[in-house]
Swiss-Prot record:
Domain Hexokinase as annotated: residue spans: 37-488
Location(s), subcellular: Plastid, Chloroplast outer membrane
UniProt name for this protein: Hexokinase-9
Originating gene: HXK9
CDD domains (alphabetical): ASKHA_NBD_HK_plant (cd24020)
Length: 502
């Protein structure tokens, strides 16, 4: 009797456990479905807010062109600085000789040597060396910093081979890429406005960076001088023009973003100097600071901007560049984790850490073509410490990456279209004239989806008639080789030869 009662009791308990288990399982399934529905709503809302149809992109391009004209009309007339670079002549391909470049823009700098052989041989030989800047020199003095640079430059010059020696009496010439804000006064002169990127040498602000470098070079006994002071965007334009004379503009799509282009000097009202012989002038747009009510920005863009070191500034750059796209994805995933069960019941602690998800991580996930999206899973585990994710979650993460990358690529295309539109008013026959846009930077170079989307969007904006006449070409290392090419283009010896032959 007792045994039967015990068996009955056990059966009842098992049945109760089964019922409870079934109820819990049903609740979990209902919760999972509710979470999936909420995730789908959030994704759809994101996609709608990031949508950039061609009609909207044309409005963005119109606004870009209008801001360009306003920036050219007067200093401070636009959010675009539209800086006159004093570069009025770009490499032709006929330059000959050996030229140097110094690329200083962060915690490392590079020195380059380029041997040019004219139109037939072009770049014969190219050497470069990268050097790390000790931390203490970033806040020491201009004298110590530039002396360190000059010592490295002198060692690099000393490594010239027999085939690199200059003719007797010839001075070495250097193109200087300085990627900090400067007020340029001539092609080879510019005063530092402020430091960025961990540099803090206060006494250097307001000084001529070229004069400081030339002085340090002389102290090393080097017979060398700076021929051209440029930034990486202008260098990319020079490198693009060197290989293709139809190059009209250059765009950098990397950690940051910028553009430069060739305009008619008489289309620059704020230019008060004598018109250059070429009739042209390269303009450094500083287009990252562009803003417009037509930009399809989301709450995530607004929050990122408000919490950035420069709120209200570089709004366009914050939607298209490598510094920020990965962070936008992180912010979106964090909101999804807070409002749904995308990553389970708890929010992954690392997901709350700003800038932990880089655009490099984003592009690796976005390029995952495996059937189970294993690369996405591995990245989420590696970067955010998320041990397990379902296929649905991985697909959602990929879709978020696609929404941000697509918007960024389409907005970058709109910026390029704005430049073409601005120049169109000076083109005799824009439908038949071939135009090349030189592009460099890690986002363009490595984020294949981004670059392809940007190019196809630009074609859509141009239309069937104009699209074949505009080409985007990747130009590698404009900040290095481009600077050396500008040194060659403005060589005192090249100028003398031109004068003799005229």
């Amino acid at each position: 009797m007792r045994k039967a009662a015990a068996l009955a009791s056990a059966a009842m308990a098992a049945a109760a456990v089964a019922v409870v288990s079934t109820v819990l399982h049903q609740r979990q399934r209902r919760a999972a479905k509710r979470s999936e529905r909420a995730e789908a709503v959030l994704l759809r809302d994101l996609q709608e807010r990031c949508a950039a149809p061609v009609e909207l992109l044309r409005q963005v391009a119109d606004a870009m062109a209008a801001e360009m004209r306003a920036g050219l009309a007067a200093e401070g007339g636009s959010d675009l600085q539209m800086l006159v670079t004093y570069v009025d002549s770009l490499p032709s391909g006929g330059e000959k000789g050996m030229f140097y470049a110094l690329d200083l823009g962060g915690t490392n700098f590079r020195v380059l040597r380029v041997q040019l052989g004219g139109k037939e041989r072009r770049i014969i030989k190219q050497d470069s060396e990268g050097i790390s800047i000790p931390q203490h020199l970033m806040s020491s003095s201009s004298h110590e910093l530039f002396d360190f640079v000059a010592v490295a430059l002198a060692k690099f010059v000393a490594s010239e081979g027999e085939d690199c020696h200059l003719p007797e009496g010839t001075q070495r010439e250097l193109g200087f890429t300085f990627s900090f804000p400067v007020k340029q006064k001539s092609l080879a002169s510019g005063t530092l406005i402020k430091w960025t990127k961990s540099f803090a040498i206060d006494e250097m602000v307001g000084k001529d960076v070229v004069a400081e470098l030339n002085m340090a070079i002389r102290s090393q006994g080097l017979d060398m001088k700076v021929t051209a002071l440029v930034n990486d965007t202008v260098g990319t334009l020079a490198a693009g023009r060197y290989v293709n004379h139809d190059t009209i503009a250059a765009v950098i799509l990397g950690t940051g973003s910028n553009a430069a282009y060739i305009d008619h000097a008489d289309a620059i009202p704020k230019w008060h100097g004598s018109l250059p012989k070429s009739g042209n002038m390269v303009i450094n747009m500083e287009w990252g600071n562009f803003k417009s009510s037509h930009l399809p920005l989301t709450e995530f863009d607004q929050e990122l901007d408000a919490e950035s070191l420069n709120p209200g500034k570089q709004v366009y750059e914050k939607s298209i560049s490598g510094m920020y796209m990965g962070e936008l994805v992180r912010r979106i995933l964090l909101k999804m984790a807070q409002e749904t069960r995308i990553f389970g019941d708890n929010i992954p602690p690392k997901l709350e850490r700003p800038y932990i998800l880089r655009t490099l991580d984003m592009l690796i996930m976005h390029h995952d073509t495996s059937s189970d999206l294993r690369t996405v899973a591995n990245k989420l585990k590696e970067v955010l410490g998320i041990e397990y994710t379902s296929f649905t979650t991985r697909k959602l993460v990929l879709d978020v990456c696609e929404a941000i990358a697509t918007r960024g690529a389409r907005l970058a295309a709109a910026g390029i279209y704005g430049i073409i539109q601005k120049l169109g008013q000076h083109s005799d026959s824009p439908s038949t004239r071939r135009s090349v846009i030189a592009v460099d930077g890690g986002v363009y170079k490595y984020y294949t989806f981004f670059s392809q989307c940007m190019e196809s969007t630009l074609s859509d904006m141009l239309g069937q008639e104009l699209a074949p006449s505009v080409m985007i070409k990747h130009v590698n290392d404009g900040s290095g080789v481009g600077a050396a090419l500008l040194a060659a283009s403005y060589s005192q010896y090249h100028q003398a030869e031109s004068a003799d032959s005229s």
